[in-house]
């Protein structure tokens, strides 16, 4: 947004300025667009600064000083993930930048943007949001620096973090600042993180001990504690749990795992408690998660007047938009519970679904776009087939703390009917101007097995030749560490998929997404997977190395070498050479990987897989001497 655009709207000043590390795309798949439209819908004047130059504060001044606050996001993904490969090399393409150009956002973007804003406007409130701030809200392992870093709120000169899907939080913050409240007094909004002075925290704890009959060693209460009625010790310590401090978790991996387990199990909007984590210069306090949006609220958010286009100032397309331009978001949340995924911590396990009518209205608008070719190329949310699903316990106690929804097997309390999704897909197919409705990715195949009608409809109408699914691995030890279904479930799905395709008279294929280097995965496990692929014909180029990203179970395993829920020790491949060997075993047919595959087989004592026999992964040949 430019100053000229502000003037064209007849505005003399803005209420809120959003700063993002992504290009600005006015589409509901982009977090900044949603937050901007939601604030605008609530009556606020909103400006957006996309991908500012961060070497000095000048770009942050171009829209002037907002009346209420700045909101800062690194973008749709963590800036480390956007900028760097799993091997920590610079990426050669950025899907969230015009033309895929790299170098338009810094590493640790949320912190750097906040610093520049503070230089430009020292007294302005700053609210952090988005996946980077959300997943770094506690002390966390940082893969780039290979150490435990403080909460992002301790490192950035910001006042609040909005974590999760932040529509309700951001509007309430704006309304309360509009009403004249000081941002430092806004401490009671679910789904936010705030900070307290160390002295005030010690006094609050002292008062808590006094009320519990212990000796209060604190002096007179600070002004912060004395004036804030929400800091009644008796009530506070009923609603909040203290976890080990930054100093403790950064020095002891077992303590890190213990702290992780505590806050992971409290991420429940119904029964969860707030979390307190002391840091050397401040106290980080997370309120319990915000509730999911209702169906009516979700419908409203997704039917705001998005243009579905990039900002007109861009001369090149933004690749991320091209992937989702003609797709439809049906729901939020995921109860899959994969250890390496951040969605559980960001969107929660409880599914919030839009109404069928709302989705149909959006689909009709897509058909009216001049570049629409009759194909809706994606229908779903974090997964394709959890739309409309629910559990009878969610309303009263949220998602269960003592068990997962799908692992090690599908919970019988879960309603796994695809009936509502089937109705939606059928009605989408009937819309004038729609030739195909595809769901070629994101299908949770263990859920699909629960509903044969859905699987048959999927094969008959909603795949364009290939179905991309993510078994991730075929070693039981590794899929257990990932909290993913084992190969037996995969094989059952593949059999049913092939049977339904034969029935439909279609020739369609499964494309597997696989992962190397996950905690718990050894060279022997990778060889087991290579042998499975050899025997079952699932060789694929769709592979990735495990990347430790903040606040996932797998990252906790990677850093600590422990399962945070059982305390069991786990093998972790940290050596670059072993990581390369693990990845090479997934591409054992590639001649460029011969030496790495040979070394892996030699190290694992499996040279029986080198030779000309059918079972061999690579042929025997004269190796280059090093």
Curated annotation (Swiss-Prot):
Co-factor binding details: Binds 1 [4Fe-4S] cluster. The cluster is coordinated with 3 cysteines and an exchangeable S-adenosyl-L-methionine.
The name this protein goes by in its record: UPF0313 protein MM_1287
InterPro entries given in the database record: Elp3/MiaA/NifB-like_rSAM (IPR006638), Methylthiotransferase_CS (IPR020612), rSAM (IPR007197), rSAM_horseshoe (IPR023404), UPF0313 (IPR022946), UPF0313_C (IPR024560), UPF0313_N (IPR013704)
Gene3D superfamilies referenced in this protein's UniProt entry, alphabetically: tm_1862 like domain
Cited Pfam families: DUF3362 (PF11842), Radical_SAM (PF04055), Radical_SAM_N (PF08497)
Known cofactor(s): [4Fe-4S] cluster
Top-level taxonomy: Archaea, Methanobacteriati, Methanobacteriota, Stenosarchaea group, Methanomicrobia
Stated family: Belongs to the UPF0313 family.
Residue ranges of every copy of the Radical SAM core domain listed in the record: 320-589
UniProt binding sites for [4Fe-4S] cluster: 334, 338, 341
């Amino acid at each position: 947004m430019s100053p000229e655009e502000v003037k064209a709207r007849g505005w003399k000043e803005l209420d809120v300025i959003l700063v993002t590390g992504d290009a600005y795309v006015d589409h509901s798949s982009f977090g900044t667009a949603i937050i901007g439209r939601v604030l605008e819908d609530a009556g606020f004047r909103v400006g957006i600064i996309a991908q500012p130059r961060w070497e000095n504060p000048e770009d942050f001044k171009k829209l002037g000083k907002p009346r209420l606050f700045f909101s800062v996001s690194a973008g749709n993904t963590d800036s480390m993930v956007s900028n760097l490969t799993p091997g920590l090399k610079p990426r050669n393409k950025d899907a969230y930048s015009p033309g895929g150009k790299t170098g338009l956002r810094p590493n640790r973007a949320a912190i750097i943007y906040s610093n520049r804003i503070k230089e430009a406007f020292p007294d302005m409130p700053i609210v952090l949001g988005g996946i980077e701030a959300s997943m770094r809200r506690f002390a966390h392992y940082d893969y780039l620096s290979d150490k435990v870093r403080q909460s992002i709120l301790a490192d950035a000169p910001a006042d609040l973090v909005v974590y999760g899907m932040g529509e309700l939080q951001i509007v309430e913050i704006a309304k309360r600042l509009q009403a004249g409240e000081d941002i430092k007094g806004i401490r009671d909004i679910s789904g936010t993180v705030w900070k307290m002075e160390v002295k005030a925290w010690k006094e609050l704890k002292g008062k808590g001990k006094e009320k519990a009959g212990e000796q209060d060693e604190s002096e007179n209460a600070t002004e912060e504690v004395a004036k804030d009625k929400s800091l009644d010790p008796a009530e506070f310590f009923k609603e909040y749990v203290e976890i080990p401090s930054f100093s403790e978790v950064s020095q002891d991996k077992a303590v890190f795992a213990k702290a992780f387990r505590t806050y992971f199990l409290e991420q429940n909007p119904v029964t969860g408690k707030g979390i307190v984590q002391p840091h050397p210069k401040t106290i980080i306090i997370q309120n319990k998660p915000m509730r999911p949006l209702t169906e009516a609220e979700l419908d409203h958010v997704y039917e705001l007047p998005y243009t579905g286009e990039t900002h007109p100032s861009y001369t090149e397309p933004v690749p991320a938009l091209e992937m989702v331009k003609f797709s439809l978001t049906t729901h939020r949340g995921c109860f899959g519970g994969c250890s390496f995924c951040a969605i559980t911590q960001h969107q929660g396990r409880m599914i919030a679904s839009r109404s069928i009518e709302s989705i149909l209205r959006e689909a009709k608008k897509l058909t009216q776009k001049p570049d629409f070719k009759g194909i809706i190329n994606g229908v779903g949310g974090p997964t394709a087939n959890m739309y409309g699903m629910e559990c009878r316990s969610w309303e009263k106690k949220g998602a269960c703390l003592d068990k997962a929804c799908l692992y090690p097997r599908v919970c019988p309390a879960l309603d796994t009917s695809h009936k509502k999704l089937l109705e939606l897909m059928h009605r989408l197919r009937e819309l004038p101007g729609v030739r195909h409705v595809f769901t070629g990715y994101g299908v949770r195949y263990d859920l699909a097995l629960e509903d044969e009608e859905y699987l048959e409809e999927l094969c008959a109408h909603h795949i364009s030749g290939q179905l991309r699914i993510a078994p991730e691995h075929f070693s039981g030890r590794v899929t257990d560490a990932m909290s993913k279904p084992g190969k037996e479930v995969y094989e059952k799905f593949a059999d049913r998929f092939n049977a339904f395709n034969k029935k439909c008279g279609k020739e369609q294929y499964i494309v597997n997404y696989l992962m190397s280097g996950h905690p718990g995965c050894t060279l022997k496990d990778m060889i087991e997977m290579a042998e499975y692929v050899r025997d079952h014909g699932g060789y694929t180029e769709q592979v990735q190395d495990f990347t430790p990203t903040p606040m996932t179970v797998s990252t906790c395993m990677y850093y600590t070498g422990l399962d945070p829920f059982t305390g069991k020790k786990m093998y972790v491949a940290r050596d670059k050479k072993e990581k390369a060997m693990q990845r090479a075993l997934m591409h054992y047919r590639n001649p460029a990987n011969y030496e790495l595959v040979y070394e892996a087989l030699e190290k694992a004592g499996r040279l029986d897989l080198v030779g000309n026999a059918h079972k061999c992964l690579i042929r025997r040949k004269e190796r280059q001497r090093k």
